[in-house]
Amino acid sequence: MKIAKRIVAIIGIVSVLAFAALLVNYICGERMIDRYNKRIYESSTVNAYLGFTQPYIYHYNKGDIYYSQGDYKGAENEFKNALKWEPGVPQDCEMRINYALSIVKQIDPQTVTKDNLDETIDRLEEAKAALLKNGCAHDEDENGHNSDAQTLKDEIDK
């Protein structure tokens, strides 16, 4: 009988801790979205620690903030950090699209010369490679499992 009570107590404690972790993640996400909608584009490092069950979200949100501010290099770095956490589908493709866009936005077609053409092509190939990874887009056909990633890859090919 004592063992059954202990098991029930342990299950109860684990359930409360799991609920608390999910609640903290939810509150941090809602707070970030609320501030973003109010055009308060800043991030709290507290969210990085409190969002421990989905650590990629902090970097993804921070990348969105940088992108909104026109800091495409900062956005690129944050999306790259988010991808290191290997989020599942569909987040993976969404992050790859944003990562690729942050690279493309750093390229000004008016400033491309013979001297920097190879570097520009390398950057576009980097963006394209990100879209092709994990099948978000396909190189030889239109069968990538994310239509936005496929469209962006096709635009880069042009």
Q: Residue ranges of each PLM-predicted region?
A:
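N-terminal Lys/Arg-rich, disordered targeting/topogenic segments
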Residues: 1-2
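Hydrophobic membrane-insertion alpha-helices, especially the h-region
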Residues: 5-24
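Alpha-helical protein-protein interaction scaffolds
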Residues: 28-155
